[in-house]
């Protein structure tokens, strides 16, 4: 049995196919979704979406949004998403280092909040670019 997973951003469809299982980062922690999961709607946090397909795990960096699960259909609407295989690990690491430096030099509440969000996004991209063993 499979699940139909759709990952959508405002600009494009990132994923639209059947999967065996997913692990989704929500605002209240990670949840695993298998076929025949109870229907839910949840907020999606900045984090990794893990997808099991053909007994292999794939990753995707999600940048916050919402998910709806029901009748073996999963729709994930996010601000942005990138498949782990599409992320250049060196570029992601450089972005992380810049984000860490920006957090240290941020002044004022707004700058600190924006710098910390950029740091979370950068960490997520680095994590997604590393294959799951």
From Swiss-Prot:
Pfam families: ATP-synt_DE (PF00401), ATP-synt_DE_N (PF02823)
Swiss-Prot/TrEMBL GO biological process terms: proton motive force-driven ATP synthesis
MF annotations from Gene Ontology: ATP binding; proton-transporting ATP synthase activity, rotational mechanism
Keyword Ion transport among record annotations: yes
Main location: plastid
CDD domains found in the cross-reference section: F1-ATPase_delta (cd12152)
Alphabetized InterPro entries for the sequence: ATP_synth_F1_dsu/esu, ATP_synth_F1_dsu/esu_N, ATP_synth_F1_esu_C, ATPsynth_dsu/esu_N
Subcellular location: Plastid, Chloroplast thylakoid membrane
Record bears the keyword Protein biosynthesis: no
Key words, A-Z: ATP synthesis, CF(1), Chloroplast, Hydrogen ion transport, Ion transport, Membrane, Plastid, Thylakoid, Transport
GO cellular component: chloroplast thylakoid membrane; proton-transporting ATP synthase complex
Membrane topology: Peripheral membrane protein
Protein family according to the UniProt entry: Belongs to the ATPase epsilon chain family.
Function description: Produces ATP from ADP in the presence of a proton gradient across the membrane.
PANTHER family: ATP SYNTHASE DELTA/EPSILON CHAIN (PTHR13822), ATP SYNTHASE EPSILON CHAIN, CHLOROPLASTIC (PTHR13822:SF10)
Description of how the protein assembles with itself and partners: F-type ATPases have 2 components, CF(1) - the catalytic core - and CF(0) - the membrane proton channel. CF(1) has five subunits: alpha(3), beta(3), gamma(1), delta(1), epsilon(1). CF(0) has three main subunits: a, b and c.
Protein name: ATP synthase epsilon chain, chloroplastic
Organism: Solanum tuberosum (Potato)
Gene that produces this protein: atpE
